Regions:
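N-terminal cap/lid subdomain of alpha/beta-hydrolase-fold enzymes
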Residues: 53-121
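Conserved acidic catalytic loop of the alpha/beta-hydrolase fold
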Residues: 133-153
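Conserved hydrolase catalytic core segment
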Residues: 150-193
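Alpha/beta-hydrolase-fold enzymes
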Residues: 175-259
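Short beta-strand/loop motif that positions the catalytic acidic residue
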Residues: 288, 294-296
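Conserved alpha/beta-hydrolase "acid-adjacent" motif
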Residues: 301-309
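Catalytic active-site module of serine/aspartate enzymes centered on a nucleophile-bearing elbow/loop
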Residues: 317-358
Length: 358
């Protein structure tokens, strides 16, 4: 599975996005092996290989790291997605909000994603059934044990990474100065969001070609799952602009499904979608200590603002506030979370408000 977040952004952007590597330090890639990792399900993996990327250099103040920034990807994503121009080109360059010559930026491929251990590596449906709690623990191990980072200037994430941001604030409340979840809600996944996820899971599992995860060729049920995935993250405004006729709309869809079928793995997608089953931060929101800014967009069909959930729940976060980005030609539905130009002014404000006095 290439990535839910990038799949959405690519489908919405409908353009080739270049890396802005020349404007910030080159990322360094690394791996960390966690031995005998025990999952919340009770399953164990002898070696959990965690892949990560970092930009910049660690800085310490009185023996403690004071410039680390954790950025977490969405369902099906990886850390590399944040190196695209629409994100890194707006944030990581000199003088930009997360200037990589000033901050130490951490981009981790979560369990089941990117170059980190996942079902398609060989275990297929015998891979441990990981959940968000496992992913948070593994992220923390990479940061604390491999990178020796004891404090985070900022924790932020998009979509699933946004949900992880809420969980980080609850699980490690004294470890960060600020939190910025994007395109997420701090409640159990339910309603239409859960129904769409179940549709994707059922589309794969009920396909005889899936063969309980031991398929040789991609099961056709993956097509149904990808169709739902595309609609979940779509922007009616952007898609109408890109495909204003019947023929262009058909080609738009056919081209993307054909490409994703070559790139994606059914088991990986199945596990990625199912991993949200334990997400339920609502009852512990009061445990969050750091200032938190939750950013969603008005055209996000996964987290539609008319539900009023974010506005209701943010009141339970001591230093929390919410910002809803209005629909415009610059928003891209759920995928707005990766278009940093749309919301980076809010990030600048958060960083300014939480800057420690020297």
């Amino acid at each position: 599975m290439k990535r839910l977040a990038a799949l959405m952004a690519a489908a919405l952007a409908c353009c080739t996005v270049a890396h802005a590597a020349s404007s910030y330090p080159a990322p360094a890639e690394g791996d960390y092996v966690i031995r005998n990792f025990k999952f919340a399900s009770g399953e164990t993996l002898p070696e959990l290989h965690m892949h990560y990327r970092t930009l910049g250099t660690i800085h310490k103040n009185h023996g403690h790291v004071d410039n680390a920034v954790l950025v977490m990807h969405g369902t099906g994503g990886d850390g590399a997605q944040f190196l695209r121009d629409i994100f890194a080109g707006e944030l990581f360059g000199a003088g930009q909000p997360l200037d990589a010559t000033k901050y130490f930026i951490i981009l981790i491929d979560d369990i089941g994603h990117g170059k980190t251990s996942k079902p398609s590596d060989g275990l297929h449906a015998k891979f441990p059934h990981y959940a968000y709690a496992d992913m948070i623990l593994a992220e923390h191990d990479v940061i604390a044990k491999k990178l020796a980072v004891d404090h985070l200037r900022l924790v932020m994430g998009t979509s699933m990474g946004g949900m992880h941001t809420w969980l980080w604030g609850e699980t490690y409340p004294d470890m960060m100065d600020a939190l910025m979840p994007l395109a997420s809600l701090p409640v159990q996944i339910s309603g239409r969001n859960r129904m769409m996820r179940k549709m994707m899971i059922d589309s794969i599992r009920t396909d005889p070609e899936w063969k309980n995860g031991d398929y040789a060729q991609p099961p056709h049920g993956l097509v149904g799952a990808l169709n739902i995935l595309l609609v979940m993250g779509s922007s009616p405004l952007q898609w109408q602009k890109e495909a204003p006729t019947r023929d262009s709309a058909d080609k738009f869809l056919d081209d993307r499904i054909a490409r994703y079928m070559k790139e994606d793995d059914a088991n990986d997608l199945l596990y990625q979608i199912d991993s949200s089953r334990d997400y339920d931060p609502q009852s512990k929101l009061s445990a969050i200590k750091a200032p938190l800014l939750a950013v969603n967009s008005a055209d996000d069909q996964i987290n539609p603002p008319e539900l009023g959930i974010l506005e209701r729940e943010i009141k339970n976060v001591s230093h929390g506030r919410a910002f809803i980005i209005p629909i415009s030609d610059a928003t891209h539905g759920h995928g707005t979370h990766t278009w940093a130009a749309v919301w980076k002014d809010q990030l600048v404000k958060l960083m300014s408000e939480t800057e420690r006095k020297k």
